[in-house]
Structure formats: structure tokens, C-alpha cells
């Protein structure tokens, strides 16, 4: 039975939404066992007793969003996140899911779970929506690394392409390099060198992609340095929130005609909202570690966490980590 470590105390809605999500997913995943790390009293109130698929590991500390990541990992040794990461490191669990402090989770992933031998740097990779289909696209790295080298981006592209194929079911994923122009000679020295590395690789490399093209579905995998990727991710998320707020305000606070228009456009608006629902893709994966580590947004509700649990099950089923170990440790 595969074992998924759940940081039950991470995020704004912990532990209730996390428990609800796992209990919803559990009947669909009979081969998985869920190990909850956190406040034992709260866990026992929320979880069924005598369930072979559920285990509780009591912890006494929580890493907060405002905690400094490295210091938190070193000083809060009995926190739900750190204890869960150690269980994964020791082989007592096969994967880790957390909604907690992103920096702390990255730190625990890199320094406790550890990176795969041969992988220069792990990369953080979410799946984002596109306008043309429900398939979405992967973008890596979105903030695990402040600085990057060409070989990092090549490895991220290789791992992300394999993920897109095996977990998302994309045949021959199209890989693109985020750049400031479509031409091959665009960008700084880093991007020019990465372009050549991708061109010479066995990946289905389609060239550069510009920022305004990201949501158009022109690539299945977009590779970028962590600094740029983090800025792009936050820009997309922020713009989406602003647009939704403006639509709601415009339709509901501008008189009877606007409200009537909202009623008439209800189905179309629902369709658009469904297309750009990124929760259905699960969380962001820290690719390149000895075991899967997935970060779901701290504000996630039970529905979003449910999809992250299903995502981890798929990653374990496809045995991605061992494939990466065989490939990069040569």
C-alpha cells in the first residue's frame, strides 16, 4: 500500500478542509494510505477510527506563513511539515502534500527529502489553464531557484515533459522556452544557451514563447528561470482575481439591466470559469526530489485539495521518481 504524508496543519483552512478532501478521495484510491501529521486531538475529532487507510502522527508545532523557512525547519523539528518530510526521507511515506509555508516546504523538500543524484536543482511546477482546452500547460520553475544555469532549465524541461506525458496524458508534449521574443536569437546569454540546449535535445521543442501567448495553449510545457517564472505566475493569478472582481462588480452593482445581462450570460460565464479553474489540475510539484512533494495553495478548499490528492496518486502510479533517478543518475 502506498503511503501519502499529509501536513494536516498547513494552510488557512487546516485541518478541516484537508481532512474533508482526503475522506472524499479515499474510496477512489484503495491502494493508498493517508498519514495525517498534526494536532492529534483535532485529527481524532475529524477522522474515522479503525480505518486501515488512515493513520495519525501527533505533532506539537506548526510552521506559520510568517516564519523564516530555513529557521523554521531547523527550530520547529516537531512541526507537522518537518515530521512529515522526515517520514518521507526515511521511507515510511512515499509522498508529501502540504498547504503550508511555500518557502519552508521547498526547504524541507530540498534539505530533508533530498534531491535526486544527478539533478542539479529541483524545479517548482504548477499546471496552469489555457483558453483553448481543458488540458492546461506546465510551467517550470516558478520560484524554487532565484538564479539559474542553462543545464538547470534543460533538466526541468526533461522532467516536466515526462510529467506532462505520464500524469497529464499528453502525447509528445510541446516544450517552449519563455523569452522576450519568438526569434531564436532573442534574450540574454542564458536564454540563448538554453535555446540551443533544447534545440539539440530529444524533446519536442517548439521554440520561444512570449508572455502574452502563455494562456493560448501553444505549448504543453513552458520552461523558464525561477525568478521570471515566479513573477509570471503571480501576474497570471493576480490578473485573474482582478478580472473576476471587476466582472462581479460590473454585473451586480450597475442596475437592473446589468443584473439581467448577468442572468442571460450565466451559462457562458460558468463555462469560462470552468475553463480557467486551475484547482482541477492539483498542486505545484517540486520535481527532482527523491520522493514527490506537492504544494497546494494555502487558501485552498476541500475541492482543490481533493485534486491534489488524486494528482499524487497518479504520480506514484506512474513511478515518476524512479524514472528520474534512472535517467539522471547515469
From Swiss-Prot:
<keyword id="KW-0443">Lipid metabolism</keyword>
<comment type="pathway">
    <text>Lipid metabolism; phospholipid metabolism.</text>
</comment>
<keyword id="KW-0808">Transferase</keyword>
<keyword id="KW-0594">Phospholipid biosynthesis</keyword>
<dbReference type="GO" id="GO:0043811">
    <property type="term" value="F:phosphate:acyl-[acyl carrier protein] acyltransferase activity"/>
</dbReference>
<keyword id="KW-0444">Lipid biosynthesis</keyword>
<comment type="function">
    <text>Catalyzes the reversible formation of acyl-phosphate (acyl-PO(4)) from acyl-[acyl-carrier-protein] (acyl-ACP). This enzyme utilizes acyl-ACP as fatty acyl donor, but not acyl-CoA.</text>
</comment>
<comment type="similarity">
    <text>Belongs to the PlsX family.</text>
</comment>
<dbReference type="GO" id="GO:0008654">
    <property type="term" value="P:phospholipid biosynthetic process"/>
</dbReference>
<comment type="subunit">
    <text>Homodimer. Probably interacts with PlsY.</text>
</comment>
<keyword id="KW-0963">Cytoplasm</keyword>
<protein>
    <recommendedName>
        <fullName>Phosphate acyltransferase</fullName>
        <ecNumber>2.3.1.274</ecNumber>
    </recommendedName>
</protein>
<dbReference type="InterPro" id="IPR003664">
    <property type="entry name" value="FA_synthesis"/>
</dbReference>
<dbReference type="InterPro" id="IPR012281">
    <property type="entry name" value="Phospholipid_synth_PlsX-like"/>
</dbReference>
<keyword id="KW-1208">Phospholipid metabolism</keyword>
<dbReference type="GO" id="GO:0006633">
    <property type="term" value="P:fatty acid biosynthetic process"/>
</dbReference>
<dbReference type="GO" id="GO:0005737">
    <property type="term" value="C:cytoplasm"/>
</dbReference>
<dbReference type="Pfam" id="PF02504">
    <property type="entry name" value="FA_synthesis"/>
</dbReference>
Amino acid at each position: 500500500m502506498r503511503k501519502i504524508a499529509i501536513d494536516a496543519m498547513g494552510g488557512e483552512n487546516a485541518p478541516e478542509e484537508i481532512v474533508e478532501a482526503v475522506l472524499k478521495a479515499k474510496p477512489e484510491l484503495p491502494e493508498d494510505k493517508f498519514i495525517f501529521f498534526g494536532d492529534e486531538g483535532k485529527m481524532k475529532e475529524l477522522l474515522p477510527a479503525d480505518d486501515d487507510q488512515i493513520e495519525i502522527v501527533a505533532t506539537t508545532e506548526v510552521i506559520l506563513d510568517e516564519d523564516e523557512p530555513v529557521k523554521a525547519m531547523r527550530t520547529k523539528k516537531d512541526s507537522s511539515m518537518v515530521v512529515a518530510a522526515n517520514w518521507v526521507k526515511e521511507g515510511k511515506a512515499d509522498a508529501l502534500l502540504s498547504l503550508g509555508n511555500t518557502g519552508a516546504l521547498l526547504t524541507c523538500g530540498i534539505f530533508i527529502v533530498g534531491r535526486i543524484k544527478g539533478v542539479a536543482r529541483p524545479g517548482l511546477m504548477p499546471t496552469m489553464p489555457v483558453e483553448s482546452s481543458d488540458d492546461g500547460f506546465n510551467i517550470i520553475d516558478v520560484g524554487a531557484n532565484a538564479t539559474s544555469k542553462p543545464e538547470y532549465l534543460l533538466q526541468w524541461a526533461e522532467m516536466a515533459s515526462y510529467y506532462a506525458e505520464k500524469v497529464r496524458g499528453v502525447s509528445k508534449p510541446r516544450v517552449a522556452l519563455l523569452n522576450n521574443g519568438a526569434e531564436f536569437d532573442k534574450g540574454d546569454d542564458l536564454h540563448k544557451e538554453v535555446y540551443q540546449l533544447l534545440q539539440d535535445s530529444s524533446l519536442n521543442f517548439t521554440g520561444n514563447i512570449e508572455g502574452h501567448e502563455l494562456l493560448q495553449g501553444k505549448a504543453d510545457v513552458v520552461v523558464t528561470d525561477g525568478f521570471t517564472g515566479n513573477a509570471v505566475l503571480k501576474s497570471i493569478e493576480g490578473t485573474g482575481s482582478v478580472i473576476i472582481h471587476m466582472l462581479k462588480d460590473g454585473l451586480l452593482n450597475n442596475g437592473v439591466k446589468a443584473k439581467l445581462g448577468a442572468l442571460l450570460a450565466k451559462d457562458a460565464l460558468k463555462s469560462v470559469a470552468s475553463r480557467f479553474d486551475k484547482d482541477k489540475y492539483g498542486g505545484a510539484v517540486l520535481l527532482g526530489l527523491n520522493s514527490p512533494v506537492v504544494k497546494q495553495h494555502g487558501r485552498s478548499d476541500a475541492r482543490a485539495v481533493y485534486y491534489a490528492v488524486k494528482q499524487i496518486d497518479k504520480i506514484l502510479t506512474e513511478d515518476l521518481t524512479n524514472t528520474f533517478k534512472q535517467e539522471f543518475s547515469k
